[in-house]
């Protein structure tokens, strides 16, 4: 039962207690399908792209560059962990799932720690006068979920929005595994002219019992 629909294998403590994220059978082998979904969700929201996803995925030694139809780039950076391995990392001093927004005048980076890193610092002086963007305070997520259960209204981050974020994570993971550029059609959710990548979009689930 502990495997769910994943391929069968003998029990190993390395597969549980959070360490399952490092194995392709349970994640993408790069934490792209777990931590990545939280971060990509924020990028989708900031780009007003909840209705779509990046269309091109370019894996590099240092990152995966995901490009939207409007030209905006979502870059998944690879950072070295304490043991020297390089891969997508989702925990820094800014908290979990840090995101950096880069524009023509500078950048703003933050995570769930509440700390913000603004460059240049002159941008920080404009924060109080900046119009608040759409969305809810992160502390309201739980309340929003329970309210939706009662009212039957969609949550702020509804299943359709999260589905597209997860597809983007899967596409980035497959580009990284295959080590080549991939292009996806958001309408059909299939890779363009790439039979091998399309075969990897699905695998037969194992019977639970």
Residue ranges, per PLM feature:
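Contiguous beta-strand/loop segments that form the cofactor/metal-binding neighborhood of enzyme cores
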Residues: 1-160, 164-209
